[in-house]
Amino acid sequence: MSKANISSKLKKVVESIYNPKLADSWDNTGLLLEAPFPRTNASSVLLTIDLTEKVAEEAISNKLVSSIVAYHPIIFRGLKAITMEDPQQRSLLKLAAEGIHVYSPHTAVDAAVDGVNDWLAQGIAGGRNNIKSVVPTQQNSVMAEAEGYGRICELKIPTTLRELVQRAKELTGLQYVQVCAPNGLDSHISKVSLCAGSGGSVVMNTDADLYFTGELSHHQVLAAMAKGISVILCGHSNTERGYLKDVMCQKLASSFHKEGVDANVIVSSMDADPLTTM
């Protein structure tokens, strides 16, 4: 198999798994940085949630990295200048000079079948037959009913909030999570509404016993509590990061293989949530 065509196949491979038509209209997904002179004989693709300077330096120092797939887009709003003064722009300039492409799939991963929200749903609820999207997409496809933002999980066996908190910790690898328990930790949960990242706009108007997401505003948590709805918050990127290692790595490697490309798909060791609980 070839190792020289990774950067040229990057867009096709990512979009074969995460259809860009699923991305939200406000989002900025796709190939965000196309290096003019791609690295030759580079066989690795680096996955990250956030393309920070530390992650960019990690990619640059590893001469086998040809491309970065950054879940969150490093370019979101229009740029009026690209200078070395701005940390993000500095990273882009360095990556371009080093021949490294950058692709961001973001909300296409959120909405896709077997995307980040299905990973959360299977981790918190188990099984697949009791999971559906909160906001289905309008795509004309056989998977349309399963695609979309957020997930509603109807638990086959009602489970205590205490147990679901433990599942959330195990899934995300966190020692601590934030919990709102208006009915107590031993209250039984039958229906979970979840969304990776900042899920308030998705979960808040759903009929559920528990909201499970990365972050909600203070007033959204108060509103949930007033309605007797429990809440588990793990931090924005903590609800996304584990998906890279558990699912995306294998999916991309398999898709590259189908294209006749022997790609080594790796997860950044420098990518981390910016907040730490002490």
Swiss-Prot record:
Gene3D superfamilies: NIF3 (NGG1p interacting factor 3)-like
GO cellular component: cytoplasm; cytosol; mitochondrion; nucleus
Domain of life of the native organism: Eukaryota
Pfam families, alphabetized: DUF34_NIF3
InterPro entries: DUF34/NIF3, DUF34/NIF3_sf
Family (UniProt): Belongs to the GTP cyclohydrolase I type 2/NIF3 family.
Alphabetized PANTHER family for the sequence: NGG1 INTERACTING FACTOR 3, NIF3-LIKE PROTEIN 1
Protein known as: Protein NIF3 homolog
Record organism: Schizosaccharomyces pombe (strain 972 / ATCC 24843)
